[in-house]
């Protein structure tokens, strides 16, 4: 079929398998250009491995350190009539490239919040990966979670706490600056958001892996977070999602105390703002990203997901000098350090106040934001012929759960 982008709100409803594959190949090339190191992770489990930071970290571990990787995700394959999700094509492209490079790659498609998934992962670690993993990456961003004990569905919300929040935002369909009003979360919504996006599931994973004795000595685990800046704090860090991320921090401290007994440790890694399917859904964030990208590009500080993942593994968790990573007062690895530089944020605040419909494309990197967003789904690549016939049914070595 011939596939062109179709967008609805902050979602692109079509995906391009060839474009997605090329996106993955581009990230692999970026990691390979930094050279392969041997003093790093050997056997890696990535929970949430099909897009964004999870995919980038899987690429960095495999192609930057030669690691065996097991990836868990929840994606839809394409059919004769309909393309699959971008994550399906990303995972397929990773698997193909890893196997071509002689690397061990295993993938499981299913609900990462379920006990069945944990059992399957443990079974594969024992039967195929030598019985242990030494790095567990937790990178789930989900709007809902089915509680493994009760089967109840909890949903996360992107809402402030206490009072409604009014902010500048972009209507990405009309390319217009709008005033977005977001009503505050209820107590139940806050609790449910913590249940979905907090540290509970990460801890269940580490508990299960510990009890099954599949964590190697010196195992590290990392979960991803975002703090952002004053511009986004009301909706994010000071909102329902911020409560979930605070729960993630508390979980990290508990897990770290336990893993230190094995000579390992746990950290939350705070990452920079990037264009992902998750960030596109957060009011005010696309406009802020369009501004901060312009500022960081002008200062030579810009990074995408793969550059962040490479820096996380090479300069934080697995430093060449063998020293422990620098952490903040909450024991977090900060990879938003360049974004939060005073000079960067001061410029962002000035532009935030000045931006209008008339100067949106001049003052910000909004044109590239739109391009980067469509690129997530395999579009806007100069090396892909989008009028060519393409097969949406892509198969690969994946266990369906």
From Swiss-Prot:
Which amino acid positions bind substrate, per UniProt? 226
Binding of NAD(+) occurs at 48-53, 74-75, 111-112, 140-141, 245, 274-276
Molecular function (GO) terms for this protein are: enoyl-[acyl-carrier-protein] reductase (NADH) activity; NAD binding; trans-2-enoyl-CoA reductase (NADH) activity
Q: Return the EC number.
A: 1.3.1.9
- Enzyme active site: 236 (proton donor)
Q: Which domain of life is it from?
A: Bacteria
Q: In which pathway does it act?
A: Lipid metabolism; fatty acid biosynthesis
Alphabetical list of InterPro entries matching this protein? Eno_Rdtase_FAD-bd_dom (IPR024906), Enoyl-CoA_Rdtase_cat_dom (IPR024910), FabV-like_NADH_b (IPR050048), Trans-2-enoyl-CoA_reductase (IPR010758)
Protein known as: Enoyl-[acyl-carrier-protein] reductase [NADH]
Supply the gene name: fabV
């Amino acid at each position: 079929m011939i596939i062109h982008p179709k967008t609805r709100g902050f979602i692109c409803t079509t995906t391009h398998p060839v474009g997605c594959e090329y996106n993955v190949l581009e990230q692999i090339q970026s990691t390979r250009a930094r050279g392969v190191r041997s003093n790093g992770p050997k056997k890696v489990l990535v929970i949430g491995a099909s897009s964004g930071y999870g995919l980038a970290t899987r690429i960095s571990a495999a192609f930057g350190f030669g690691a065996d990787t097991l990836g868990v995700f929840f994606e839809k394959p394409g059919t004769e009539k309909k393309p699959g999700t971008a994550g399906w094509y990303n995972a397929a492209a990773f698997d193909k490239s890893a196997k071509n490079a002689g690397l061990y790659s295993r993938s499981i498609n299913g609900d990462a919040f379920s006990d069945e998934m944990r059992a399957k992962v443990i079974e594969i670690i024992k039967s195929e990966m030598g019985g242990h993993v030494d790095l567990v990456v937790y990178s789930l961003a989900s709007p809902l979670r089915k509680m493994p004990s009760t089967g109840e569905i909890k949903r996360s919300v992107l809402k402030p706490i206490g009072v409604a929040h009014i902010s500048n935002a972009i209507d990405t369909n009309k390319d217009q600056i709008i005033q977005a009003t977001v009503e505050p979360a209820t107590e139940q919504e806050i609790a449910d958001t913590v249940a979905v996006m907090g540290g509970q599931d990460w801890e269940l994973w580490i508990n299960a892996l510990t009890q099954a004795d599949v964590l190697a000595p010196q195992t590290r685990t990392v979960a991803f977070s975002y703090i952002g800046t004053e511009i986004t704090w009301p909706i994010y860090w000071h909102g329902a999602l911020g409560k979930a991320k605070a729960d993630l921090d508390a979980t990290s401290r508990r897990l770290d105390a336990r893993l230190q007994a094995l000579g390992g440790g746990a950290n939350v890694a705070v990452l920079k703002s990037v264009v992902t399917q998750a960030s596109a859904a957060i009011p005010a964030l696309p406009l802020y990203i369009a501004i901060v990208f312009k500022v960081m590009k002008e200062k030579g500080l810009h990074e995408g997901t793969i550059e962040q993942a490479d820096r996380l593994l090479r300069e934080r968790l697995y430093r060449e000098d063998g020293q422990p990573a620098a952490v903040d007062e909450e024991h977090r690895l900060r990879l938003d350090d360049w974004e939060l530089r005073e000079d960067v944020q001061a410029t962002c605040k000035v532009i935030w106040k000045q931006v209008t419909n008339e100067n949106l494309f001049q003052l910000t990197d909004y044109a590239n934001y739109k391009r980067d967003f469509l690129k997530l789904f395999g579009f806007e690549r100069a090396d892909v012929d989008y009028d060519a016939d393409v097969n949406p049914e892509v198969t690969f070595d994946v266990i369906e759960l």
